[in-house]
Design a protein with these regions (language model features):
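Flexible, solvent-exposed loop segments that connect beta-strands
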Residues: 152-158, 209
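Extracellular loop and loop/strand-boundary signature of outer-membrane beta-barrel proteins
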Residues: 121-122, 156-160
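N-terminal segment of the mature soluble domain
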Residues: 49-52, 56-144, 167-184, 274, ...
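C-terminal/domain-edge helix-coil "capping" segments
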Residues: 17-49, 162-282
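Outer-membrane beta-barrel translocator domains and adjoining extracellular loop/strand segments
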Residues: 147-152, 198-201
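C-terminal motif of bacterial Sec signal peptides marking the signal peptidase cleavage site
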Residues: 12-15
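Positively charged n-region of N-terminal signal peptides that target proteins for export
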Residues: 1-4
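Sec-dependent N-terminal signal peptides
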Residues: 6-8
Length: 282
C-alpha cells in the first residue's frame, strides 16, 4: 500500500508540473513559423529571369464549415489563400507578383495621384502587365482520413492517447497571358495532425478516502499554417515542373540541374529512370 501511495504522489506531482507550464504561456505576436517547404522554395536554383505573375483570386472551393454542434458559420479552412500564394511567389526568385486582388483600390489611388499632377499626368508610370496568370484554389478538405488511439487502465490508474489526421488539397495552375495556354498544373496535399494524451487516477486509498486526478495534453496543427505550406509546396512543384517541361529556363543549366531541392521534387513526380534521363539531356 505504501508503494502505491508513493506512486500516486509522484503521479500527482508530475501532473502539477505539467499544469504549471500553462503559467508560462504568454499571449504574444510573432512571424508565422517557416516550414520545410519554405526552405525548399528559397533553395531552388536561380532562374534566367523573374516572371511577372498575377493572382486575382485563390479561394476556398470546398464550401465546408467547421463541424461544431452549436450554430457556427466559420469555414473549415482560411479564406486567405490569395495572400498566402502572393507571399510564396514573392519569396521565390522565379516570380514577381503584381497586385490584382486589390486592383480597384490601386486604380483609385492612381486616379487621386493623377488628379494632383494636373497637366503632368504622363509622369505617372503605367502598371506592369503580367506574363503569367496564376489560377486555382483550395479544392478539398477531408476530415478523419485516419484516426486511432491506445489506452490502458489497471486498478483505477490509466493513460490513453488518440490522434486524427485531416487533409488539405491545393491546385495551382500557370496560364500564359498571351495565348491562354496552360503551362503547368499541380495538385498538392498537406496533412493536418491532431493528437491528445491523457492520464488519470480514480482509486480508493481506503474505505473513506478517494484519490482522483487527471492530466491531459492536446496538440492541433494550425490549419492556416498547413494551407500556407501546401501552397508553398505547389509553387515549388510548379517551378520544378516548368523546368522539366522547359517552359522556363535556369540561369545556369549545368549547375541548376544538380540542385538537390530540384531533384527531390522531380523524384516525387517522376520515376528515378526518367529523372536520370532528364538530367543526362541537360
Amino acid at each position: 500500500m505504501k508503494k502505491l501511495i508513493l506512486l500516486l504522489i509522484l503521479f500527482i506531482v508530475s501532473a502539477c508540473s505539467s499544469t504549471s507550464e500553462l503559467e508560462q504561456i504568454e499571449a504574444s505576436s510573432s512571424l508565422m513559423p517557416k516550414g520545410e517547404t519554405y526552405y525548399d522554395l528559397i533553395g531552388l536554383p536561380a532562374p534566367q529571369g523573374s516572371m511577372v505573375a498575377a493572382v486575382y483570386d485563390f479561394r476556398d472551393q470546398t464550401g465546408q464549415y467547421k463541424p461544431i454542434p452549436s450554430s457556427n458559420f466559420s469555414t473549415a479552412v482560411p479564406q486567405s489563400g490569395t495572400a498566402f500564394l502572393a507571399q510564396a511567389l514573392n519569396d521565390s526568385s522565379w516570380f514577381t507578383p503584381v497586385e490584382r486582388e486589390g486592383l480597384q483600390n490601386l486604380l483609385t489611388e492612381r486616379k487621386i495621384v493623377r488628379a494632383g499632377l494636373k497637366g503632368d499626368a504622363a509622369s505617372l508610370t503605367q502598371l506592369n502587365s503580367a506574363q503569367i496568370l496564376m489560377e486555382g484554389g483550395i479544392v478539398a478538405y477531408d476530415t478523419n482520413i485516419r484516426t486511432g488511439g491506445a489506452g490502458a487502465r489497471y486498478l483505477g490508474i490509466g493513460a490513453s492517447s488518440q490522434f486524427r489526421v485531416d487533409s488539405i488539397t491545393v491546385n495551382l495552375r500557370a496560364v500564359d497571358i498571351r495565348t491562354g495556354r496552360l503551362l503547368s498544373s499541380v495538385t498538392t496535399t498537406k496533412s493536418v495532425l491532431s493528437k491528445e494524451l491523457t492520464a488519470g487516477v480514480f482509486k480508493f486509498i481506503d474505505a473513506q478516502e478517494l484519490l482522483e486526478s487527471e492530466v491531459g495534453y492536446t496538440s492541433n496543427e494550425p490549419v492556416s499554417l498547413c494551407v500556407a505550406q501546401a501552397i508553398e509546396s505547389a509553387v515549388v512543384h510548379m517551378i520544378a515542373d516548368g523546368i522539366w517541361k522547359r517552359a522556363w529556363n535556369l540561369a545556369d543549366t549545368q549547375v541548376g540541374l544538380q540542385n538537390e531541392v530540384l531533384k527531390k521534387y522531380w523524384l516525387e513526380a517522376h520515376s528515378v529512370d526518367r529523372v536520370q534521363a532528364r538530367l543526362n539531356q541537360g
